[in-house]
Amino acid sequence: MRSDMIKKGDHQAPARSLLHATGALKSPTDMNKPFVAICNSYIDIVPGHVHLRELADIAKEAIREAGAIPFEFNTIGVDDGIAMGHIGMRYSLPSREIIADAAETVINAHWFDGVFYIPNCDKITPGMILAAMRTNVPAIFCSGGPMKAGLSAHGKALTLSSMFEAVGAFKEGSISKEEFLDMEQNACPTCGSCAGMFTANSMNCLMEVLGLALPYNGTALAVSDQRREMIRQAAFKLVENIKNDLKPRDIVTREAIDDAFALDMAMGGSTNTVLHTLAIANEAGIDYDLERINAIAKRTPYLSKIAPSSSYSMHDVHEAGGVPAIINELMKKDGTLHPDRITVTGKTLRENNEGKEIKNFDVIHPLDAPYDAQGGLSILFGNIAPKGAVIKVGGVDPSIKTFTGKAICFNSHDEAVEAIDNRTVRAGHVVVIRYEGPKGGPGMPEMLAPTSSIVGRGLGKDVALITDGRFSGATRGIAVGHISPEAASGGPIALIEDGDEITIDLTNRTLNVNQPEDVLARRRESLTPFKAKVKTGYLARYTALVTSANTGGVMQVPENLI
């Protein structure tokens, strides 16, 4: 066993003495059993994580029943909804790297035989997956689960995106103070990840198709008995996989990454999944070309439109058959998925999901009646984004295939929000928000406030927004993010000026500023070099090492320093 490194031999008597002091070893034979880490992310200020202490206790009990010894440790977590709209958002994406580094440190320092990961919200899930790829120790994931959807006094279904859009609607005067307060009190009624197809739930669903989690991981409610039983079953399966030496890199292959993007397309997932899945591929040693994503989009139908793109919540999807029903439907179209690859269950993706039929065709559409013949995400290329940009086409009004407008440029999120709120931004504008990428932000902050304000003011079909920052999974409208290279790295988005005509072509997947190359070249000559906004602490180190979004926004040590 891997853990023999810390518990076998006379020279490890001091280590064994310390292990006895933990109280985790209940009998003389326990030292001969596998040591299993429980990588938890319990934290009081994140509603998606307040219940994870209870889930970890269930996992510990089940791991002991299965014949192994559990040891729990915790990682940090950032709630994107609470960190939104201020400098706290600078820490959200960078927290992913801290989580990965922290888990790697504990797992490798103590030579665990396996790891039970309990994530739930936005950056915690991908951070833990990065750690699993990096350490490549037998592992299983079981998330905390989504919260129930809220319900307003008027019987309207609510999610967190409803609340962000309500801010713009209230400022516009289209809802009353009483309606506003009612929504605030009822949008998030239970613990769990936010109820729509936002980043947290997108990633938790993707773990099913990647093969790292059990079926229904992405949709079973946080407060359900099914979630607690899933924790138990995952614990038993992990101990079995330790014995069989089934490792994360055996499961997460190039084909698994393809299938993750296919599910994302079918469910209209968050644009952040592109960023995180590219980072996962990088950590797994898989060279993954962005162009593959468009090829996957072309062959994958859009089957389930979930909040913020509709009123359906994750619970509605669960009741309609969950991710297994969507996977089963996609498997009926040859060439869409790679169903014969191994998963954490020890069975193939096909064996896990075959025969799981759709129970509600309003929530999950069949292959012969999709929302769209092509997937809900697109990668755009052009002279603004030579290395790519991302748009959630599933969140754009279906009548819009191209949008051309006049640029109105801002060098920060806050400047843009102020201009939208004071009505400087008008119909026909393309809002350009730059110097908000991984280096520029720093931390690639989410642009939910400006996009929600645009939609809340009734301009969702008349104003576009492009940025080298990113979006919340709750974002909808004509919103293009992850523009690469970012402005802070000298990307062409830095060259756009007010009044430039910009065309977003969803059909041809292009993003261009309609200016001659010689004009852009002259502008580049006078471009002021970017200076880091943060000079000390973690964000200063992050700024120095982080890459643009097209490579997943990962931290890389320059080759000349290795």
From Swiss-Prot:
Residues bound to [2Fe-2S] cluster: C121, C194
GO biological process: isoleucine biosynthetic process; L-valine biosynthetic process
Cofactor descriptive note: Binds 1 [2Fe-2S] cluster per subunit. This cluster acts as a Lewis acid cofactor.
Pathway entry: Amino-acid biosynthesis; L-isoleucine biosynthesis; L-isoleucine from 2-oxobutanoate: step 3/4; Amino-acid biosynthesis; L-valine biosynthesis; L-valine from pyruvate: step 3/4
Annotated keywords: 2Fe-2S, Amino-acid biosynthesis, Branched-chain amino acid biosynthesis, Iron, Iron-sulfur, Lyase, Magnesium, Metal-binding
This protein's record includes keyword Kinase: no
Gene Ontology MF terms in the entry: 2 iron, 2 sulfur cluster binding; dihydroxy-acid dehydratase activity; hydro-lyase activity; magnesium ion binding
EC numbers: 4.2.1.9
InterPro entries: Dihydro-acid_dehy_C, DihydroxyA_deHydtase, DiOHA_6PGluconate_deHydtase_CS, ILV_EDD_C, ILV_EDD_N, IlvD/EDD_N
GO CC annotation terms, alphabetical: cytosol
SUPFAM superfamilies in the record: IlvD/EDD N-terminal domain-like (SSF143975), LeuD/IlvD-like (SSF52016)
UniProt enzyme class: lyase
Pfam families reported in the protein's UniProt record: ILV_EDD_C, ILVD_EDD_N
Catalysed reactions listed for this entry: (2R)-2,3-dihydroxy-3-methylbutanoate = 3-methyl-2-oxobutanoate + H2O; (2R,3R)-2,3-dihydroxy-3-methylpentanoate = (S)-3-methyl-2-oxopentanoate + H2O
N6-carboxylysine modified-residue sites: K123
Binding locations of Mg(2+): D80, D122, K123, E446
Residues at the catalytic site: S472
Cofactor(s) needed: [2Fe-2S] cluster; Mg(2+)
Family that this chain belongs to: Belongs to the IlvD/Edd family.
Subunit structure: Homodimer.
Function (record text): Functions in the biosynthesis of branched-chain amino acids. Catalyzes the dehydration of (2R,3R)-2,3-dihydroxy-3-methylpentanoate (2,3-dihydroxy-3-methylvalerate) into 2-oxo-3-methylpentanoate (2-oxo-3-methylvalerate) and of (2R)-2,3-dihydroxy-3-methylbutanoate (2,3-dihydroxyisovalerate) into 2-oxo-3-methylbutanoate (2-oxoisovalerate), the penultimate precursor to L-isoleucine and L-valine, respectively.
Entry-linked PANTHER family: D-XYLONATE DEHYDRATASE, D-XYLONATE DEHYDRATASE YAGF-RELATED
Entry protein name: Dihydroxy-acid dehydratase
